[in-house]
Amino acid sequence: MGTEFNGLFDEWAHTYDSFVQGEDIQYKEVFAHYEDILEDVVNKSFGNVLEFGVGTGNLTNKLLLAGRTVYGIEPSREMRMIAKEKLPKEFSITEGDFLSFEVPTSIDTIVSTYAFHHLTDDEKNVAIAKYSQLLNKGGKIVFADTIFADQDAYDKTVEAAKQRGFHQLANDLQTEYYTRIPVMQTIFENNGFHVTFTRLNHFVWVMEATKQ
């Protein structure tokens, strides 16, 4: 993942919070139970947390309130500006992405929500391999994102979006890199993790991977 999505992120920054509140009918199901999803990620995290894709700071705020020490990474300048308005003044957000970032001294948990699909499956593998080197035994990766149980589930979801006239959603599903559970399970296991997948709405699953 380079900077190819930065323009999209900057454009989306000022409307993102309305999306997650379900104001766009096409994405309402994608963000169903949004607060519960964030809380689940927080509850599965511990210690020093590295967060990729801070966005407008919604997950970050919950992590801080839960007493986590958070290192935030966000590629979009506009997103960083909005997040800084919502978060404590002393909290800093570093420019970077899943593959290119400043490594904090000690990390226990790596988290992200609604962002890992910006990487191809090959890039996902590179990223997880990198994180495996950063985490000690017992360290965790907790990612919430749109993924699919298998190809059939993906195909049916795309077709349903088209049938409902949700053409923007269908295009999104077909142009970004939404992966399948077997792919992610293989990636995690090949890099020394035990992983579980928990579905929290039709689109979003929480991946909880523990370093062995």
From Swiss-Prot:
Annotated GO biological process: methylation
Record keywords, A-Z: Methyltransferase, S-adenosyl-L-methionine, Transferase
Top EC class of this enzyme: transferase
InterPro entries tied to this protein: Methyltransf_25 (IPR041698), SAM-dependent_MTases_sf (IPR029063), Uncharacterised_MeTfrase_YrrT (IPR023553)
Domain of life the protein comes from: Bacteria
EC number, UniProt record: 2.1.1.-
Keyword Signal belongs to the record: no
GO molecular function (one): S-adenosylmethionine-dependent methyltransferase activity
SUPFAM superfamilies noted in UniProt: S-adenosyl-L-methionine-dependent methyltransferases (SSF53335)
Residues involved in S-adenosyl-L-methionine binding: G53, E74, D97
Known function: Could be a S-adenosyl-L-methionine-dependent methyltransferase.
Protein family membership: Belongs to the methyltransferase superfamily. YrrT family.
Protein name, UniProt field: Uncharacterized methyltransferase BT9727_4108
Annotated source species: Bacillus thuringiensis subsp. konkukian (strain 97-27)
